[in-house]
Amino acid sequence: MRFKRILLKLSGESLMGKQGYGIDPERLSDYARQIKEVSEMGVQIGIVIGGGNIFRGLSGSQKGFDRVKGDQMGMCATVINSLALSSALGAIGVKNRVLTAIRMEPIGEFYTKWKAIEAMEAGYVCIFSAGTGSPYFTTDTGSSLRGIEIEADVMLKGTRVDGIYTADPEKDPTATKFNDITYKEVLARGLKVMDLTAICMCQDNNLPIYVFNMDIVGNLKKVMQGEEIGTLVHN
């Protein structure tokens, strides 16, 4: 088994599937089954989901919302997605807990590092929601923070593309893929892997990132089995 403990980062937009908004039940079910497969391998799993399928704080501020209020709305969107994933996992027999960065019992338990690690070691999938609990931080940064805190072996960034390219492969047909790349090169090239704060946190704390296509069913298990289907970012 490639990694013992992982932090899986999923984008909110990915939950939309082919819809333009909200949560696609089929996509949610696909993700839940992939997570179950890996959980049954004995992998300890922490998950962070974005909220962009419902509301994005930064775009809200561009439309006239107060930035802090907008970011708080985005945090609430991540909680909605986390509850949806929790429900989908529970429906197929996967023990899980939703932990929130802001107190909102009984919707979820208030997050602490020790509570999360204890739950994962007991076989629960932990879903971390509400970002960092503070405005001005993206869910990518929240993922980096949680990955570092729970001492994950890697952050797996599930996207709709199969890794990191020299340019956006959906716009530039000449873009070429990296199988692995250093943090320094990511920063020097200005590649849009995650925001700068998130990248620097992972670099400073030696947390590697593996970017892969989560939309292809079975890919999460392939990553755990050591198949090279994405891009590894490392020091």
Language model: regions and residue ranges:
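C-terminal catalytic "cap/lid" subdomain
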Residues: M1-N235
